[in-house]
């Protein structure tokens, strides 16, 4: 009887002790770098959702090794971040100790699932030897002018005591923990990701990534081409610029809108409107950008009492403020053409502002018309369609010096400051004379000091500000300075970790340039779709910076990306609060790691979200037990190969075996693991129907199944008399000539009635088919005493006999 508890521990110990999965370095072999999104080691440990992606990459790693590749398949820990700090605050524990305990637990769970990681390359972002290089990258960005300080409106979370990035705010609350977020201005470190906007956008075209992820990044970057136009304030020397993608509709502008935070608002508001304007500005303080720009929300706004002059026709148009205009997007001001823009139309209708048609084609008494049409009421644009009119208007604006063509981006620079303790220290010193300098490279890493009081200060300073011994510094000339007390966000360490796996113990460089050339880019990267505009965008940005520095040899880090779906329970996402989390440890204990791995790959397509079935692993275990019984006789103490295994081949399994090798190999390559496993089940069914199984086919099947259920397959391989791990056995190949049947079944009719079937070599001659048909005992009966008048043979199908 197969005992998974004994066998799985035995092989896990063997793999670890023998370093079976050490990264290959044979210069003659091609490389394959297969990567999981490394996990945040939370206190909860793994749930059954984690192993789905990990099993998929593990199958690929194991197959590629067997196919003769040097495989890099590493694992590490994204260990900085708010959850550990929140836990530490609530319990009084040290986040470092808590994190290391969690890592040990996670690692034990991963090893119990038999993943073929090269543990010699394990990294964690909280290791000073690792974040030395995170700090080094920051310093290079600073020198390139890509890291700068600015007073910016930020998403401040008082509960967390820190700022969170735009990407981390959902419906006015923090992505993690759901705490309320308020807008306020603070001094922040920013990374100039906008300098790379065009490259981040254009290079998406060359990547083998899911289209929805590419589309999310395109929308996030949000490149739009239009014009920037200057509007003067009536009776004033003040003016403001607006960006518009529809300069052709300027003749239809009936009002303008400024962001409430726009500096100009205070200067131009009339005394009569001041109270209303101030009250409105206060009312929107806690709204996030996403809430403010939601198309479905009710429009709000206030008139400033000021008027602007439309440069194309000299008309006076009222200046309003509204929260849907963001100070950080474009110029923080927009023109409103309600006849041809849905949002402007809703606003104008609500506040009874004029609606002027300048493009024919709709009914503006009912709704805005945003389509193409002939321009009217537009002076020199009359009679033109949209694109021609845009070009002509841009030329006119440029000629008159009141505007120009402009490309705009929705993406903002990346807010890189966090007012927390548990993050990488930013290696910067602010001196009393106003100078800011970097910590010298030879002094990196700037270590995070050990500290028990890590309570957020509730101010723009992090808890590090309380550590005066650490913060205060004096240079050799007696000049006093203070260290930067903000720390980096959790996204910093994960923006380059895939490079460190290539050379994890290098203390002279982030990684050896020759090794980077050998291994980059990552060939396959599997992880969740929820990181589309965070980690995946940030990592691409950092990689491009490192490419410009000559540190990395490729423009992009991840050639192929694949998103695994969610594993649901009762059609809901698993979470502790819902009480529907399935712990993999329990499944492994009862059914074995091989059963869990095989079930998760067999559930359905890898990229689909699928409901967990509690009976699933037991069903898969029955299949695996059948594999064991088919190949192994374990009636005595020492298991031996089953009596069915033979060195002879009678050809009965030729077609199904070669089909199985072909299908499994192709479907693994395409990440269609569920259909590959189905094919292996079909082969096992065929094995039940024959008396003998050729050893070559039994061993070939074990090699195919080993990436999915590695423990049992190692054991069977060992029973078959092999000393080395099945991982070192060459991947099976198929014989194309055996994919077609060598024999066919033909039917026989006598005088129009079916009288039997017979097997014969495919494409046998008419004479051979007739001889075989007339030799059948049942046919002989019906021909007795009769004369055969005619025989019609349809090759490979039927023999028709006419007899009298």
From Swiss-Prot:
Principal location class: cytoplasm
Domain of life where this protein originates: Bacteria
Residue numbers covered by motif 'KMSKS' region: 573-577
Gene Ontology molecular function terms on file: aminoacyl-tRNA deacylase activity; ATP binding; leucine-tRNA ligase activity
GO terms under cellular component: cytosol
One annotated GO biological process: leucyl-tRNA aminoacylation
Motif interval(s): 'HIGH' region: 39-50
InterPro entries (alphabetical): aa-tRNA-synth_I_CS, aa-tRNA-synth_Ia, Leu-tRNA-ligase, Leu_tRNA-synth_edit, M/V/L/I-tRNA-synth_anticd-bd, Methionyl/Leucyl_tRNA_Synth, Rossmann-like_a/b/a_fold, tRNAsynth_Ia_anticodon-bd
Cellular compartment(s): Cytoplasm
NCBIfam families per record: leuS_bact (TIGR00396)
PANTHER family linked: LEUCINE--TRNA LIGASE, MITOCHONDRIAL, LEUCYL-TRNA SYNTHETASE
Protein name (record): Leucine--tRNA ligase
Organism per entry: Lactobacillus delbrueckii subsp. bulgaricus (strain ATCC BAA-365 / Lb-18)
């Amino acid at each position: 009887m197969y005992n998974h508890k004994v066998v799985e521990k035995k092989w896990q110990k063997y793999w670890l002790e023998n370093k079976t999965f050490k990264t290959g370095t044979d210069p003659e072999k091609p490389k394959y770098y297969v990567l999981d999104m490394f996990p945040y080691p939370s206190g909860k440990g793994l749930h059954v959702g984690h192993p789905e992606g990990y099993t998929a990459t593990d199958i690929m790693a194991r197959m590629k090794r067997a196919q003769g590749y040097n495989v890099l398949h590493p694992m590490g820990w994204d260990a900085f971040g708010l959850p550990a700090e929140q836990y530490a605050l609530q319990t009084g524990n040290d986040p470092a100790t808590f994190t290391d305990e969690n890592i040990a637990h996670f690692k034990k769970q991963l090893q119990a699932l038999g993943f073929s990681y090269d543990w010699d390359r394990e990294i964690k972002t909280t290791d000073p030897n690792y974040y030395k290089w995170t700090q080094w990258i920051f310093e290079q960005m600073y020198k390139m002018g890509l890291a700068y300080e600015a007073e910016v409106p930020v998403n401040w979370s008082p509960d967390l005591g820190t700022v969170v990035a735009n990407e981390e705010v959902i419906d006015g609350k923090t992505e993690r923990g759901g705490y309320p977020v308020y807008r306020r201005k603070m001094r922040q470190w920013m990374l100039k990701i906008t300098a790379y906007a065009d490259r981040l956008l254009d290079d998406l075209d060359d990547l083998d990534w899911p289209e929805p992820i590419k589309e999310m990044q395109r929308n996030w970057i949000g490149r739009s081409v239009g014009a920037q136009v200057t509007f003067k304030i009536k009776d004033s020397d003040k003016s403001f610029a607006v960006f518009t993608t529809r300069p052709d509709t300027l003749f239809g502008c009936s009002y303008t809108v400024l962001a409430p935070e726009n500096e100009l608002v205070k200067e131009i508001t009339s005394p009569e409107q001041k109270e209303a304007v101030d009250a409105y500005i206060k009312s929107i303080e806690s709204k996030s950008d996403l809430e403010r720009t939601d198309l479905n929300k009710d429009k709000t706004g206030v008139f400033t009492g000021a008027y602007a002059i439309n440069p194309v026709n000299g008309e006076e148009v009222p200046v309003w403020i509204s929260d849907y205009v963001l100070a950080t997007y474009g110029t923080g001001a927009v023109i409103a053409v309600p006849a041809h823009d849905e949002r402007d139309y809703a606003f104008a209708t609500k506040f009874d502002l004029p609606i002027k048609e300048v493009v024919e084609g709709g009914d503006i008494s009912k709704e805005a018309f945003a389509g193409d049409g002939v321009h009217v009421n537009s002076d020199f644009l009359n009679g033109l369609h949209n694109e021609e009119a845009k070009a002509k208007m841009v030329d006119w604006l440029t000629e008159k010096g009141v505007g120009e063509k402009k490309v705009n981006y929705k993406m903002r620079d990346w807010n890189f400051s966090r007012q927390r303790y548990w993050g990488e220290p930013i290696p910067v010193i602010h001196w009393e004379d106003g100078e800011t300098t970097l910590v010298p490279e030879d002094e990196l890493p700037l270590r995070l000091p050990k500290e028990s009081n890590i309570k957020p200060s509730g101010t723009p300073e992090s808890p590090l500000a309380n550590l005066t011994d650490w913060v205060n510094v004096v240079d050799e000339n007696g000049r006093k300075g203070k260290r930067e007390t903000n720390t980096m966000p959790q996204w910093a360490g994960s923006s380059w970790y895939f490079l460190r796996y290539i050379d994890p113990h290098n203390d002279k460089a982030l990684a050896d340039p020759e090794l980077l050339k050998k291994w980059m880019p990552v060939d396959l990267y599997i992880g969740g779709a929820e990181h589309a505009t965070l980690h995946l965008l940030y990592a691409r940005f950092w990689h491009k910076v490192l490419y410009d520095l000559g540190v990395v040899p490729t423009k992009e880090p991840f050639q192929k990306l694949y998103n695994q779906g969610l594993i649901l329970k009762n059609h809901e996402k698993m979470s502790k609060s819902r009480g529907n989390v399935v712990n993999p440890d329990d499944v492994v204990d009862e059914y074995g790691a091989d059963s869990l791995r095989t079930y998760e790959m067999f559930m359905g397509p890898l990229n689909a979200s699928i409901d967990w079935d509690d009976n699933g692993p037991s069903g898969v275990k029955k299949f695996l037990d059948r594999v064991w019984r088919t190949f192994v006789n374990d009636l005595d103490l020492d298991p031996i190969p089953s009596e069915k295994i033979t060195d002879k081949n009678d050809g009965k399994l030729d077609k199904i075996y070669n089909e199985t090798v072909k299908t499994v190999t192709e479907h693994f390559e395409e990440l269609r693991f569920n259909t590959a496993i189905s094919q292996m089940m079909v082969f096992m069914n065929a094995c039940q129907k024959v008396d003998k199984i050729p050893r070559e086919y039994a061993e070939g099947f074990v090699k195919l199944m080993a990436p999915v259920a590695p423990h049992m397959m190692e054991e069977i391989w060992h029973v078959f008399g092999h000393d080395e791990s099945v991982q070192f056995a060459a991947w099976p190949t198929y014989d194309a000539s055996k994919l077609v049947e060598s024999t066919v079944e033909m039917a026989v009719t006598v005088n129009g009635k079916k009288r039997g079937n017979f097997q014969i070599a495919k494409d046998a001659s008419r004479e051979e088919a007739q001889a075989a048909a007339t030799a059948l005992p049942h046919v002989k009966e019906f021909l007795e005493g009769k004369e055969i008048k005619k025989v019609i043979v349809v090759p490979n199908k039927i023999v028709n006999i006419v007899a009298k």
